[in-house]
């Protein structure tokens, strides 16, 4: 009655959010299932470990010229990630340097590609990957790659490359910056983002509720290719920022 405080037998408890409650996590789950299905359909001898970086020369031929909307969306996404600290500002600035170089690439079949252009490819789920390429020592390499959900603009992967020692001392994002990356994906309300315990990841957040993992890393690599029949290589660094699904059992410890 009015003015009396009574104990409720079964007080309301808000349901714990799960991955199924979030569009982008449902999309990532479907993407993972598709990738697993494709791997199962390949001959066993061609299966390899996951690549540490994105190969360029094997992928450009499967892409098409990006229209201005896709190129602008990827550029804006990188700028916003740089503003929040989720992507190092210097890396984003170099990746988005749009000064025309006149560089081009001609593949083994004689097909010409302008490297002043942006390229993209879209999968059947609507994830669009936008990339820019460059040349180093006459070999093609990936300058940056951004994968977004085309319906929402949510970024799930950003990968950038920088030459040698310019990138060696890049600081990794703060926890606040990684939380901003979760927020742009609409996942802040999962409510339990935290650095995974006893994890080899130097910079990561994990949500048990969503089974979602955000990681950021930098690492040196040697880019290798061929110019004609002559091997060429270039020492570079990559920066990788990803949102992916992982159960607690799948977290490395």
Region locations from a protein language model:
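Long, terminal "pre-/pro-" and other extracytoplasmic accessory regions
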Residues: 1-253
